[in-house]
């Protein structure tokens, strides 16, 4: 019995020791080798006149060539036409239910009897504005673009003035439009960067108008035509935006895709074929999504600091950014971002809400990659007479101490 008890105790002790032996921690997941290497060059389209990849969130051009060179926009012009229509609709100047007439001028200049793309609406046929716009966007109808321009502004020339005004407003600095459809015309020019700015603006400002770009085919009367953006069939993350082709412009494509929370915009101008512009755009999208990511660093209106305020009713003021601060970074390098705030050492009331008080800067490996003004998130009124007097004495005393310390 004693032997059996001793054996039991020994086994129990051994079992306890075994149970208490710590389990080895799993090996740390190795970082991808590519996280520590330079980003490979973007797959530059070999035969394009100009191209780029833009991060939608920040507007940063991640890669490109000849991005500011003048190019013929061809039918990508119709994105500008869509923007103008959406803006005028938002302002109450036109409605989606307006009946738009396919005038004889629109039909003869851009209809089925021409060599260009057409919507299929018959001469003198009326259709709701939104349907005419889909005929322009999906089928790239030159006739629909003219009819819409006539409805919104009275003539193509007047509509072109609106196009140029809105282009300037959204930051297109090197573009000039003379027609709503993009057929070759003297002085009708843009750049790859400006087109990306335009695409980004349409997606951001008028998502419903942008949504027409993902329609794969449209039927008008007896005619069904496909969207010429081949990426709509090849990549489910692609949801727009517009193709273009003339003999002068070559084959062009502005595309946009969203994967997770990240969206990119690509522009390929002056390519050699319908298929090649799609292949090149797909390669650029894949490269951008693989090697870059977008981050929202700070929300608009969220306090980032509360510096001291002298001579005010309040002794502090909350500061933050007025619009979200976004940044594009190479994948795997987000943790290496370093933020700093530049604020005056002394703030005095009164301070107005929204008043710029300083800057927030974000650096990656010592290079500034994003910055934004720091503004007051609330107003601070002047304090009473005695508080202002007291704070003046304290400030004088603080300055005196600082000067004395400097002398020592």
What is each model feature region?
Residues 1-5, 404-407:
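Short, low-complexity, intrinsically disordered N-terminal peptides in bacterial proteins
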Residues 3-18:
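Gram-negative bacterial Sec-dependent N-terminal signal peptides
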Residues 3-5, 79, 259:
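Hydrophobic alpha-helical segments, especially transmembrane helices
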Residues 10, 42-44, 64, 257, ...:
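Sterically constrained small-residue positions within well-ordered secondary structures
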Residues 10, 20-30, 321-335:
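Short, compositionally biased leader-like segments
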Residues 19-45, 382, 386-389, 393, ...:
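Compositionally biased, proline/threonine/alanine/serine-rich low-complexity intrinsically disordered stretches
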Residues 20-193, 200-206, 218-221:
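Active-site-adjacent loops and short helices of periplasmic peptidoglycan-processing enzymes
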Residues 172-176, 184-408:
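Domain-terminus/edge residues, biased toward the C-terminal soluble/receptor-binding domains
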């Amino acid at each position: 019995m004693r032997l059996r008890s001793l054996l039991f105790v020994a086994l129990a002790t051994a079992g306890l020791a075994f149970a208490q032996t710590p389990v080895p921690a799993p090996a740390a997941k190795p970082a991808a080798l590519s996280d520590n290497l330079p980003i490979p060059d973007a797959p530059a389209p070999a035969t394009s006149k100009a191209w780029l990849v833009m991060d939608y969130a920040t507007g940063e051009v991640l890669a490109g060539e000849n991005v500011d060179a003048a190019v013929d926009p061809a039918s990508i012009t119709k994105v500008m036409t869509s923007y103008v229509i959406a803006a005028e609709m938002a302002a109450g100047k036109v409605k989606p239910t307006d009946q738009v007439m396919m005038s004889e001028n629109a039909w003869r200049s851009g209809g089925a009897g021409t060599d260009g793309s057409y919507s299929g609406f018959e001469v003198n046929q009326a259709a709701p504005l939104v349907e005419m716009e889909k005929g322009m966007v999906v089928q790239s109808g030159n006739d629909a673009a003219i009819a819409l321009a006539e409805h919104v502004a009275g003539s193509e020339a007047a509509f072109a003035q609106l196009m140029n005004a809105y282009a300037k407003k959204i930051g297109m600095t090197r573009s000039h439009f003379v027609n709503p459809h993009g057929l070759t015309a003297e002085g009708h020019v843009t750049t790859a960067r400006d087109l990306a700015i335009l695409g980004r603006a349409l997606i951001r400002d008028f998502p419903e108008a942008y949504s027409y770009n993902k329609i794969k085919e449209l039927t008008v009367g007896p005619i069904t035509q496909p969207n010429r953006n081949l990426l709509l069939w090849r990549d489910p993350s692609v949801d727009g935006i517009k193709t273009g082709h003339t003999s002068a412009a070559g084959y062009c494509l502005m595309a946009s895709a969203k994967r997770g929370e990240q969206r990119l915009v690509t522009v390929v101008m002056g390519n050699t074929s319908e298929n090649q512009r799609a292949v090149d755009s797909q390669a650029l999208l894949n490269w951008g999504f693989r090697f870059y990511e977008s981050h929202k660093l700070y929300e608009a209106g969220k306090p980032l600091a509360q510096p001291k305020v002298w001579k005010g009713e309040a002794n502090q003021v909350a500061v933050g950014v007025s619009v979200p601060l976004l940044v594009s970074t190479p994948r795997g390098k987000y943790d290496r971002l370093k933020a700093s705030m530049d604020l005056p050492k002394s703030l005095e009331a009164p301070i107005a809400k929204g008043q710029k008080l300083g800057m927030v800067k974000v650096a990656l490996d010592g290079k500034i990659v994003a910055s934004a003004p720091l503004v007051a998130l609330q107003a601070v009124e002047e304090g009473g007479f005695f508080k202002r007097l007291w704070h003046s004495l304290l400030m004088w005393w603080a300055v005196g101490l600082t000067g004395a310390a400097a002398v020592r």
